[in-house]
């Protein structure tokens, strides 16, 4: 093993979580390798719901437009009843974008297209996943992780400061750490398949026998080459014929129709639904993220989105510690993300029970815009402050005007791997500039003008308030005019030191 074999981060698993982390580390200049034991990229549509909060993450990572162009909005669902009647219903509550929430509803994007867009973005940043490369062993000490990789019959030993397991529900990393994965199998087995077919239109999501766990079956039109995602519960025991002929027979049995013919199957899977949560997200210098840390039933479209946001939370913290921030900053990853996963597990399981009763409509609860880290060790807040937006909340967008008269958005200010300090009508000299912190003054004579009072009304700020927004778009701190010392201490604790302090 040579110095060339030493990297900052080894990411094991090139799905949505691993790709998100890789993109974030790449734009921060962190050295890493992203390995994937499979020989080729995942080719199924499985995790197809992209929630509004994840779209905000993708905007920051530079891929939201490509993701949106790869998919579309959820179609209405056409419910076919046993008496031959049918009705069309909305699957998603209508919600128009507003300045504070620019993405109102989820998008339907096949997972393999989402991951393709992520790989393309990673390539723009000069990196690529290493397919066919497996992690076969690792051990750690106080300074890093020694990992043994196997690729095409050849083995290599490398050294990394940190190892991240994003290798799915059957995670090798989690099992090697002996981290428990408690939870339960939910007593539901289902199939999901990407198919082409004849006999159904592409303008609606077709669902037969809604609410029946014995005979329900559905066909959701996808954007890719006229295909559909076919879904349905199946018996807990026994083999399932996932060929075109087998799925055609299953369709005829459940719908009573012989005109729906499955012509081809590009990907198919039969799986048991589980709800499980890792006992720990961190063991020393090894972390778990995505499905390696939590598995959800697919109801509500939470799994992929939660995985992306795990990685988005972890990436900036790894980069900060590698640049000199206190190691304890990494403890906040599990502190913040494990409760979110526990909540999402509960939500997805409740939605599964709703589906069994025939209720499939989804509202704000699945959009992940209200997820926050209130009470986190990284949330600095005056306990007396009463407002809608407090430290730990998602930082909303708002429309402003630049000092030169040009339109401006908060999200454009947040975009990138930096922290953002918003100073509202601050008259006194405040914090010194430093690397990694962008300071924006809002108000007359400032960098930005709150000409429509959107910022003031959304954040409920008073003159002299300072709002610190983290690199992942959450409010880290809100302090008033006289609390600059507390804010300075906070910045020091997350590695944002002034020039002189940073050199010490």
Stretch-by-stretch model annotation:
Residues 120, 162, 166-273:
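Conserved FAD-binding catalytic core of PHBH/FMO-like flavoproteins
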Residues 2-8, 12, 27-28, 37, ...:
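Helical substrate-recognition/capping region of FAD-dependent monooxygenase/halogenase enzymes
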Residues 18-19:
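N-terminal Rossmann-fold NAD(P) dinucleotide-binding loop
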Residues 43-123:
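Active-site-adjacent segment of FAD-dependent monooxygenases/related oxidoreductases
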Residues 70, 241-306, 340, 344-347:
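FAD/FMN-dependent oxidoreductases across multiple families
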Residues 131-145:
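A conserved short coil-to-beta-strand element within the FAD-binding core of flavoproteins
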Residues 5-7, 153-162:
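Core beta-strand elements of the Rossmann-like FAD/NAD(P) dinucleotide-binding domain
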Residues 26-47:
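Glycine-rich FAD pyrophosphate-binding loop
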């Amino acid at each position: 093993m040579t110095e060339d074999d030493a990297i900052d981060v080894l990411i094991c698993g090139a799905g949505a979580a691993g790709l998100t982390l890789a993109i974030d580390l790449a734009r921060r200049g962190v050295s890493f390798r992203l390995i994937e034991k499979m020989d080729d990229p995942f080719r199924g549509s499985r995790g197809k719901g992209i929630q509004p909060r994840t779209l905000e993450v993708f905007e920051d990572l530079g891929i939201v437009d490509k993701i949106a162009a790869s998919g579309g909005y959820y179609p209405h669902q056409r419910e076919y009843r046993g008496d031959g009647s049918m009705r069309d219903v909305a699957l998603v509550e209508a919600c128009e974008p507003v300045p504070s929430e620019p993405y109102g509803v989820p998008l339907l994007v096949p997972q393999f297209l989402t991951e393709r867009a992520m790989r393309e973005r990673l390539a723009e940043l000069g990196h690529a996943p290493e397919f066919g490369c497996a992690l076969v062993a690792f051990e750690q000490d106080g300074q890093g992780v020694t990992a043994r990789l196997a690729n095409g019959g050849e083995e290599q030993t490398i050294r990394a400061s940190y190892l991240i397991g994003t290798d799915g529900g059957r995670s090798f990393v989690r099992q090697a750490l002996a981290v428990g994965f408690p939870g339960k199998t939910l007593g539901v087995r289902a199939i999901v398949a990407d198919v082409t077919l004849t006999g159904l239109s592409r303008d609606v999501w077709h669902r037969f026998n809604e609410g029946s766990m014995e005979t329900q079956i559905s066909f959701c039109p996808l954007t890719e080459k006229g295909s559909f995602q076919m879904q349905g519960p199946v018996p807990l025991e026994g083999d399932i014929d996932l060929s075109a002929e087998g799925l055609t027979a299953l369709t005829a049995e459940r719908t009573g129709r012989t005109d729906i013919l499955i012509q081809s199957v590009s990907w198919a899977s039969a799986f048991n639904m589980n709800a499980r949560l890792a006992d720990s997200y961190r063991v020393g210098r090894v972390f778990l993220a995505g499905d390696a840390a939590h598995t959800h039933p697919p109801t509500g479209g939470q799994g992929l989105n939660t995985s992306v946001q795990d990685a988005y939370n972890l990436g900036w913290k790894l980069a900060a510690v590698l640049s000199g921030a206190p190691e304890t900053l990494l403890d906040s990853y599990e502190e913040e993300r494990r409760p979110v996963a526990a909540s999402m597990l509960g939500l997805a399981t409740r939605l599964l029970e709703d589906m069994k009763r025939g209720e499939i409509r989804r509202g704000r609860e699945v959009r992940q815009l209200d997820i926050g880290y209130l009470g986190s060790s990284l949330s600095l807040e005056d306990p007396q402050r009463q407002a809608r937006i407090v430290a730990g909340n998602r930082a909303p967008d708002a429309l402003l005007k630049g000092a030169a008269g040009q339109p401006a958005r908060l999200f454009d200010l947040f975009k990138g791997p930096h922290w953002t300090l918003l100073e509202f009508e601050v008259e006194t000299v405040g914090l010194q500039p430093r690397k990694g912190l962008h300071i924006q003054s809002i108000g007359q004579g400032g960098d930005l003008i709150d000409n429509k009072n959107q910022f003031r009304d959304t954040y409920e700020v008073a003159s002299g308030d300072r709002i610190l927004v983290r690199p992942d778009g959450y409010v880290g701190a809100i302090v008033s005019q006289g609390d600059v010392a507390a804010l300075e201490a906070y910045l020091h604790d997350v590695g944002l030191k002034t020039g002189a302090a940073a050199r010490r």
